[in-house]
Amino acid sequence: MFKNLFKSSLMILFLMIGLSGKSFAQELKFFTIGTGGTAYTYYPVGGMIANAISKPPGSRECGKGGSCGVPNLIASAVSSRGSVDNVNAIISGLRNSGFAQSDVAYWAYTGTGTMEGKEPAKDLRTIAALFQEHIHLVALKKSNINSVKDLKGKRVSLDEPGSGTYVDAKLILESNGLSTSDVKAEALKGKAATDALRNGKVDAIFVVAGYPTGAIVELASAVDIKLVPIDGAGAKALTSKYGFFSESPIPSGTYEGVDQVNTVAV
């Protein structure tokens, strides 16, 4: 039953022993939310949640133009390298809470997958499941990359090793008979990744985010792009092996000039 909780969604997590946050003068409380890179979805969503739950001393009353948050709480969204970084920061006590992909949360809780060899984080708890995150494999429209297998020998940004995107990119390559050694892997994030693609420094980039995500919206408005399908036997193998992946399309028109594409979500 618990495993079913980790199906295809972004989660906000905390450690059961650390929910209260840091206090000052026994009244003012601080609560941090680990998010992701500022160019992607996590950071603005984290900022909205932080604003909604904050209610500093002296705030106007709820319903009278003031905050309806937790009295004397100041919450803040903190940029990070993403899901893996957030989970590790929560476990270590560096942050009070954070966003994590469902697969990363499951692996942390069970001490398996990318967290194999680490103590299972049994005190890790889910506050809410927020939304599905779709794997975007982005290339320039003029490129000859039309499937995951076409990435062989190409320059591909997998994102930073501390991110959930990096983990998922490796799994997608593996489910299509490739490994990181089959591509010229780069560890670029956010605007650095989209700029590298636009300027021809890389051939494709992986992005895991709710759609539409700002970095790709901006890229599509500047240059013709395509979303490369993640489907067929590779997607079936991935979703069969890992229950937290599901096949889910990104609709036509989500990004300028880009038709509907079949991909997977987590």
Predicted regions and their residues:
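Bacterial N-terminal signal peptides that target proteins for export
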Residues: 1-10
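Extracytoplasmic
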Residues: 28-30, 70-72, 82-85, 92-95, ...
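Bacterial N-terminal signal peptides
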Residues: 9-18
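A structural signal for short loop-to-beta-strand junctions that line the ligand-binding cleft
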Residues: 117-130, 254-263
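Pocket-flanking alpha-helical
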Residues: 63-118, 191-196, 211-220, 238-239
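Sec/Tat signal peptide C-region and signal peptidase I cleavage site
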Residues: 19-25
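Bilobed "Venus flytrap"/periplasmic-binding protein-like clamshell domains
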Residues: 30-65, 132-199
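Pocket-lining segment of extracytoplasmic ligand-binding domains
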Residues: 102, 113, 179-266
